């Protein structure tokens, strides 16, 4: 009898392992999976009735992109500054949990002579912002925990949405953003700036042209020792009593590659993911936690026995077409900054770190349109500088040609500005954005899928199909461009609008009136100053509406 009970208990335990509901700490409650021949198969939920995919999604042209920013701590202020230099943009609202941070970003608008933005603050300030009818795009740059709720609110209120990375923290959030984008027919773009770095854009051009032959393997990473930065991350007063800062706290509580997109995004584009190929399976492994655990113990003065994330995480992925991708994450240990970015093809090789280089033999370089200047060229070594420079020039990206110079002036290497300018360009010209909601899901899901793998002895885990059957409809990744005449017309209108806005603001002395409100000594004086500002602001808005 006891033996029978043991057998029953053992069978129950085995069945529990194959339960359709994942229970690991960092997983979303709705994630369903089952075992199949040693692989964890993650289910793909059916597309709700009435929804259609958003591959190649376009929206009506927006002559003037009216944007609101939510989250103005670390990344947000730079985004506000960049948008002040993009023609055809109106910055309508600035929002942060802390009002002073939102108000502090007005300086960028003032410096460029643009109209002051409305300020929103507090834990739920973004909700009122998203309800406004005069906003086209909500740009989300909050802490990770608020990426999803703000984006969800924006999409539910009919706004195009752009979300800093990682844009979704688990599969449940990925699927909800997909469903909202499909339902509302609004763009939901992941703000993966590394796709716009100069080397990555040129390598993408080369991969698309077949310079490397067929790309079979790729590597990417986010390796960045954050010791100098941990103290600058905001501590949410409602859930961070130890003041660890949101990023350290998230790594303590969650396992997996929680920041995969910088390394994964650029190589996924080179591999045409959900544009002729798709990720099918991954296996993840991590080291034990040493540095993060020590940081928390030093910060709190208490033992930390529950630090989830390892110092270094490695994820291996396979695609339907037999390609392999390796992604690494390490923000803990002392080593040089590194995103790897390596492409191994049947006819060539590209690598970005520790220095940018290309390996091609003489015949392949010639076939790629560059004549070698040396006789002993071999793919066993990297191209000499002259040949390398010629190759880079030949495969220069149109995006760099258009935005590269001003991008470098805007800081952070220029890639942030090119990302933002391209997004505005596509919205103004009614084109598909460079990254869609399926990219967002594919690049962000490594956190949960990797955690599921590692929590089950590094088992293989299948990817859900975020396109739900449409990953092979589009053949090859590409950037969209408007016809030259349409592009020129949109650009002329954008520049005219921005100059008109600046002229109206200057004529009304709007910033003098705005500053007078803050300088008022009492309530009566403040009310009087506010009335004068509101009157002038309304006049400026009316003038801007005619531009």
What residue spans do the PLM features occupy?
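Bacterial N-terminal signal peptides that target proteins for export
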Residues: 1-10
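C-terminal segment of classical bacterial N-terminal signal peptides
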Residues: 16-23
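N-terminal Rossmann-like dinucleotide-binding module
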Residues: 27-112
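Beta-strand-loop-alpha-helix segment that lines the small-molecule cofactor/substrate pocket
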Residues: 137, 143-144, 148-196, 210
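Predominantly a Rossmann-like dinucleotide-binding segment in NAD(P)-dependent oxidoreductases
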Residues: 187-189, 194-307, 457
């Amino acid at each position: 009898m006891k033996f029978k009970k043991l057998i029953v208990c053992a069978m129950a335990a085995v069945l529990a392992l194959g339960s359709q509901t994942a229970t690991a700490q960092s997983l979303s409650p709705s994630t369903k999976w089952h075992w199949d021949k040693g692989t964890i198969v993650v289910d793909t939920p059916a597309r709700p009735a009435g929804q259609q995919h958003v591959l190649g999604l376009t929206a009506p042209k927006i002559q003037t992109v009216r944007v609101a920013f939510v989250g103005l701590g670390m990344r947000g202020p730079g985004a506000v500054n960049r948008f002040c230099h993009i023609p055809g943009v109106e910055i309508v609202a600035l929002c942060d949990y802390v009002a002073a941070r939102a108000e502090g970003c007005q300086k960028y608008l003032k410096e460029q002579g643009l109209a002051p933005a409305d300020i929103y603050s507090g834990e739920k300030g973004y909700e009122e912002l998203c309800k406004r009818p005069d906003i086209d795009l909500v740009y989300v740059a909050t802490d990770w925990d608020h990426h999803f709720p703000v984006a969800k609110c924006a999409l539910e209120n009919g706004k195009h949405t752009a979300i800093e990375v990682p844009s979704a923290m688990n599969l449940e959030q990925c699927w909800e953003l997909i469903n909202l984008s499909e339902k509302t027919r609004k763009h939901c773009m992941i703000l993966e700036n590394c796709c716009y770095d100069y080397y990555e854009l040129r390598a993408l051009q080369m991969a698309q042209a077949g310079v490397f032959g067929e790309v079979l393997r790729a590597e990417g990473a986010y390796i960045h020792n954050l010791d100098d930065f941990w103290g600058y991350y905001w501590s949410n007063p409602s859930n961070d009593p130890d003041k660890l800062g949101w990023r350290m706290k998230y790594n303590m509580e969650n396992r997996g590659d929680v920041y995969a997109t910088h390394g994964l995004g650029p190589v996924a584009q080179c591999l045409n993911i959900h544009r002729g190929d798709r990720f099918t399976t991954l296996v993840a492994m991590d080291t034990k936690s040493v540095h993060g655990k020590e940081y928390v113990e030093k910060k709190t003065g208490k033992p930390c026995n529950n630090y989830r994330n390892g110092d270094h995480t490695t994820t291996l992925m396979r695609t339907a077409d037999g390609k392999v991708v390796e992604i690494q994450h390490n923000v803990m240990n002392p080593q040089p900054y590194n995103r790897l970015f390596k492409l191994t093809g049947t006819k060539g090789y590209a690598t970005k770190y520790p220095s940018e280089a290309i390996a091609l033999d003489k015949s392949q370089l010639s076939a790629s349109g560059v004549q070698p200047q040396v006789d002993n060229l071999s793919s066993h070594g990297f191209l000499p500088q002259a040949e390398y420079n010629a190759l880079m020039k030949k495969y220069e990206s149109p995006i760099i040609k258009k935005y590269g110079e001003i991008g470098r002036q805007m800081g952070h290497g220029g890639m942030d500005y090119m990302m933002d300018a391209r997004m505005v360009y596509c919205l103004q010209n009614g084109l598909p954005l460079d990254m869609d909601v399926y990219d967002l899901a594919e690049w962000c899901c490594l956190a949960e899928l990797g955690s599921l793998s590692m929590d089950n002895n590094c088992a293989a885990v299948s990817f859900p199909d975020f396109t739900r059957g449409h990953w092979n409809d589009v053949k090859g990744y590409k950037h969209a461009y408007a016809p030259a005449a349409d592009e020129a017309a949109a650009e002329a209108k954008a520049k005219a609008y921005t100059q008109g806005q600046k002229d109206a603001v200057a004529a009304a002395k709007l910033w003098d009136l705005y500053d007078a409100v803050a300088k008022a000594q009492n309530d009566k004086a403040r009310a009087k100053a506010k009335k004068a500002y509101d009157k002038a602001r309304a006049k400026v808005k009316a003038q801007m509406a005619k531009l």
